[in-house]
Amino acid sequence: MPKIIEAIYENGVFKPLQKVDLKEGEKAKIVLESISDKTFGILKASETEIKKVLEEIDDFWGVC
């Protein structure tokens, strides 16, 4: 059964933000979804505008 978890990408490695029930060496598929993809349609802004705002937030706070 598929399970969705959040991970952060650091130094070329995806690091899960919660415990993952996998055996050492076991393979898993990763589906990448950006924050702008997740929020598209919620805000009344174009995808380009959302990406620009997220880039500005990341530049200032380093959180995206």
Curated annotation (Swiss-Prot):
Homology family: Belongs to the UPF0165 family.
- Disulphide bridges: none
Can the keyword Chaperone be found in this entry's annotation? no
Q: List the source organism.
A: Archaeoglobus fulgidus (strain ATCC 49558 / DSM 4304 / JCM 9628 / NBRC 100126 / VC-16)
- Function comment: Possibly the antitoxin component of a type II toxin-antitoxin (TA) system. Its cognate toxin is VapC4 (Potential).
Q: Name one Pfam family in it.
A: AF2212-like
Which InterPro entries does the entry mention? AF2212-like, AF2212-like_dom_sf
Indicate what this protein is called per its UniProt record: Putative antitoxin VapB4
| Superkingdom of source | Archaea
Q: Which UniProt keywords apply?
A: Toxin-antitoxin system
Q: What is the lineage of its organism?
A: Archaea, Methanobacteriati, Methanobacteriota, Archaeoglobi, Archaeoglobales
